[in-house]
Amino acid sequence: MIRTLVHAKIHRATVTGADLNYVGSITIDEDLLEAAGIWPFERVQVVDVNNGARLETYAIVGERGSGTIQLNGAAAHLVNVGDLVIIMAYAQVDAKPEEWEPTVVFVNEQNAITEVKALLPVGGR
């Protein structure tokens, strides 16, 4: 059976900008996109840890090493600069739970990568 599973997660990144006048999307530092395996224009879900808002948009490439996490367009209404967000991308796969290992990118307050690891199922392997 094909299921939709999270394949990539950027965990607790800090929002650095919000631009209402941009045409949409979330701008993400290229280093973070590469580490997570998220492609430019890939659909992502963004969850604001501070206010509980959840939204879907698509990723665009931000300057490498900049730490940029910027919500653009209408989504900018749902976050504040300084909020913590979790960014997730999903894939449709035909895999058993014990075979699936999404990539999780952990960052510090400046959105620099501190750790990249596979998220194991509950109970590990």
UniProtKB/Swiss-Prot annotation:
- Post-translational modification remark: Is synthesized initially as an inactive proenzyme, which is activated by self-cleavage at a specific serine bond to produce a beta-subunit with a hydroxyl group at its C-terminus and an alpha-subunit with a pyruvoyl group at its N-terminus.
Please state the protein's primary subcellular location: cytoplasm
Any one GO MF term held by the record is: aspartate 1-decarboxylase activity
InterPro entries to which the protein is assigned, alphabetical:
Asp_de-COase-like_dom_sf (IPR009010), Asp_decarbox (IPR003190)
Question: Where does this protein act, in terms of pathway?
Answer: Cofactor biosynthesis; (R)-pantothenate biosynthesis; beta-alanine from L-aspartate: step 1/1
The protein's annotated catalytic reaction(s) are: L-aspartate + H(+) = beta-alanine + CO2
GO CC terms of this entry: cytosol
Q: Which cofactor does it need?
A: pyruvate
* Amino-acid positions noted as binding substrate in the UniProt annotation, renumbered to this chain: 57, 73-75
Residue positions of the active site: 25 (schiff-base intermediate with substrate), 58 (proton donor)
Q: What domain of life?
A: Bacteria
Q: EC no.? A: 4.1.1.11
Q: What class of enzyme is it?
A: lyase
- What biological-process terms (Gene Ontology) are attached? alanine biosynthetic process; pantothenate biosynthetic process
Report the coiled-coil segments. Answer: none
Q: How many cofactors are bound and how?
A: Binds 1 pyruvoyl group covalently per subunit.
The record ties this protein, via Pfam families, to:
Asp_decarbox
- In the record, which positions carry Pyruvic acid (Ser)? 25
**Assigned keywords, A-Z:** Autocatalytic cleavage, Cytoplasm, Decarboxylase, Lyase, Pantothenate biosynthesis, Pyruvate, Schiff base, Zymogen
What is its subcellular localisation?
Answer: Cytoplasm
PANTHER family associated with the record: ASPARTATE 1-DECARBOXYLASE
Tell me its family.
Answer: Belongs to the PanD family.
This chain's function reads:
Catalyzes the pyruvoyl-dependent decarboxylation of aspartate to produce beta-alanine.
Q: How does it assemble?
A: Heterooctamer of four alpha and four beta subunits.
Protein's recorded name: Aspartate 1-decarboxylase
Species in which this protein is naturally found: Herpetosiphon aurantiacus (strain ATCC 23779 / DSM 785 / 114-95)
What does the organism's lineage look like at the top?
Bacteria, Bacillati, Chloroflexota, Chloroflexia, Herpetosiphonales
